[in-house]
Amino acid sequence: MMVLQVSAAPRTVALTALLMVLLTSVVQGRATPENYLFQGRQECYAFNGTQRFLERYIYNREEFARFDSDVGEFRAVTELGRPAAEYWNSQKDILEEKRAVPDRMCRHNYELGGPMTLQRRVQPRVNVSPSKKGPLQHHNLLVCHVTDFYPGSIQVRWFLNGQEETAGVVSTNLIRNGDWTFQILVMLEMTPQQGDVYTCQVEHTSLDSPVTVEWKAQSDSARSKTLTGAGGFVLGLIICGVGIFMHRRSKKVQRGSA
């Protein structure tokens, strides 16, 4: 659903409303305040291809009358707005103008703003990490940080060794990044055991399929062995590459001397 708000109202209608409110106050014996605030606010709602237009009239922060395109006429919200609503409903030209607004203004603005709002999709970035470093079999908090996504509707779930975890899951509210994207933190209380695999799964309208990020529980020694093995493998590739390069270069030198 998209909502457009315009803090303005047609001058003639707004002026009529203001005069009627002030006159009604006088008739009811209430003193007109020295300072007062009158507002006319227009709102467009787009939902499933339909358009709805609301025009609200507010006096000193209290809405007293409105036009609703779903109703097709003005309605008094408080007794103060009854004279204005009755008068406007008696004016066919005003009613025709208001009834045309959904197609004339709302639909036009929706077509302009839709691609930047309702149709906009930005894929989330997902990162998983423990809140603190600690040994296995000790209580900890695993954090799934999901950020830079739009729109805000998102589903984040935790799995342990393929089974969904619902107990011990804590989530922040949706956080606005200030650039039309959002972020959220979804945390899982855990006591990791050697070999446990924790998975954060994210579902969002921008994704064709869920995104999953794993975190594997390892002891410091196992992690050190893994890093050492990975380092050795990379070093082996480098040495192998240098050897092949030197071998080819040696052959070229031999051919040149021959």
From Swiss-Prot:
Similarity-based family: Belongs to the MHC class II family.
Resulting phenotype, residue 68 to Y: In allele DPB1*24:02
Protein function: Binds peptides derived from antigens that access the endocytic route of antigen presenting cells (APC) and presents them on the cell surface for recognition by the CD4 T-cells. The peptide binding cleft accommodates peptides of 10-30 residues. The peptides presented by MHC class II molecules are generated mostly by degradation of proteins that access the endocytic route, where they are processed by lysosomal proteases and other hydrolases.
Phenotype upon changing residue 113 to D: In allele DPB1*01:01, allele DPB1*03:01, allele DPB1*03:02, allele DPB1*04:03, allele DPB1*05:01, allele DPB1*05:02, allele DPB1*06:01, allele DPB1*08:01, allele DPB1*08:02, allele DPB1*09:01, allele DPB1*09:02, allele DPB1*10:01, allele DPB1*11:01, allele DPB1*11:01, allele DPB1*13:01, allele DPB1*13:02, allele DPB1*13:02, allele DPB1*14:01, allele DPB1*14:02, allele DPB1*16:01, allele DPB1*17:01, allele DPB1*17:02, allele DPB1*19:01, allele DPB1*21:01, allele DPB1*21:01, allele DPB1*21:02, allele DPB1*21:02, allele DPB1*20:01, allele DPB1*22:01, allele DPB1*25:01, allele DPB1*25:02, allele DPB1*26:01, allele DPB1*27:01, allele DPB1*29:01, allele DPB1*30:01, allele DPB1*31:01, allele DPB1*35:01, allele DPB1*36:01, allele DPB1*37:01, allele DPB1*38:01, allele DPB1*44:01, allele DPB1*45:01, allele DPB1*50:01, allele DPB1*52:01, allele DPB1*54:01, allele DPB1*55:01, allele DPB1*56:01, allele DPB1*57:01, allele DPB1*58:01, allele DPB1*63:01, allele DPB1*65:01, allele DPB1*67:01, allele DPB1*68:01, allele DPB1*69:01, allele DPB1*70:01, allele DPB1*76:01, allele DPB1*78:01, allele DPB1*79:01, allele DPB1*84:01, allele DPB1*85:01, allele DPB1*87:01, allele DPB1*88:01, allele DPB1*89:01, allele DPB1*90:01, allele DPB1*91:01, allele DPB1*92:01, allele DPB1*93:01, allele DPB1*97:01 and allele DPB1*98:01
Keywords annotated in UniProt: Adaptive immunity, Cell membrane, Disulfide bond, Endoplasmic reticulum, Endosome, Glycoprotein, Golgi apparatus, Immunity, Lysosome, Membrane, MHC II, Signal, Transmembrane, Transmembrane helix
Name by which UniProt lists this protein: HLA class II histocompatibility antigen, DP beta 1 chain
Disulfide topology: 44-106, 144-200
Signal peptide start-end: 1-29
Result of changing residue 105 to I: In allele DPB1*08:02, allele DPB1*09:02, allele DPB1*13:01, allele DPB1*13:02 and allele DPB1*19:01
Subunit and interaction comment: Heterodimer of an alpha and a beta subunit; also referred as MHC class II molecule. In the endoplasmic reticulum (ER) it forms a heterononamer; 3 MHC class II molecules bind to a CD74 homotrimer (also known as invariant chain or HLA class II histocompatibility antigen gamma chain). In the endosomal/lysosomal system; CD74 undergoes sequential degradation by various proteases; leaving a small fragment termed CLIP on each MHC class II molecule. MHC class II molecule interacts with HLA_DM, and HLA_DO in B-cells, in order to release CLIP and facilitate the binding of antigenic peptides.
